[in-house]
A protein has these predicted regions:
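Catalytic cores of alpha/beta
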Residues: 24-32, 55, 69-85
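Glycine-rich phosphate-binding active-site loops on the catalytic face of alpha/beta enzymes
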Residues: 1-5, 38-47, 82-104
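Generic hydrophobic/aromatic pocket-lining and core-packing "Φ" positions
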Residues: 6, 26, 51, 74-75, ...
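Glycine/small-residue-rich loop that forms an oxyanion/phosphate-binding "nest" at active or ligand-binding sites
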Residues: 1-23, 32-34
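Glycine-rich beta-to-alpha transition loops that act as phosphate-gripper elements at the mouths
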Residues: 1-2, 18-23, 42-45, 64-71
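C-terminal helical cap(s) of enzyme catalytic domains, especially alpha/beta-barrels
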Residues: 9-11, 95-121
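Conserved, mostly hydrophobic/aromatic
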Residues: 37, 77, 112
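Hydrophobic faces of well-ordered beta-strands that scaffold small-molecule active sites
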Residues: 16-19, 37-39, 62-67, 84-88
Length: 121
């Protein structure tokens, strides 16, 4: 995330979830009024430990961690109070999408939603 990119995105009506990897970038985003951020690459920059450390320092800031998250680790992230959602390529593997196998994508998405205890019906 850069301030210039954020300013351009915020000037539109498009959804914008900037990516951050450091506390300094979180501070910049917060100063711009952005309180929902993508943490990427989550596992490489500290993962769960980083998000736990950021929670008390940045109250009111929520994260969507991506990068290195898989079906096995997603529940640990979703248990954190500052993580309402996670992202991961396991929900839509490249080869499954390329094959147009939307039933498998749907099944994987339903399994992912169940990890967070969300009703998919």
């Amino acid at each position: 995330m850069t301030p210039e990119l954020a300013a351009a995105a915020l000037a539109t009506e498009l959804p914008y979830i900037p990516g951050v990897a450091t506390p300094s970038e979180v501070m910049t985003a917060r100063d711009l009024g952005i309180s929902f951020l993508k943490l990427f690459p989550a596992e490489a920059v500290g993962g769960l430990a980083l998000l736990q450390a950021l929670a008390p320092v940045f109250p009111g800031v929520a994260f969507c961690p991506t990068g290195g998250i898989d079906e096995r680790s997603a529940a640990n992230y979703l248990a954190l109070p500052n993580v309402p959602i996670v992202g991961g390529s396991w929900m839509a593997p490249r080869e499954v999408v390329a094959a147009g196998d939307w039933a498998t994508v749907r099944s994987l998405a339903e399994r992912a939603a169940a990890i967070g205890g969300r009703n998919t019906a």
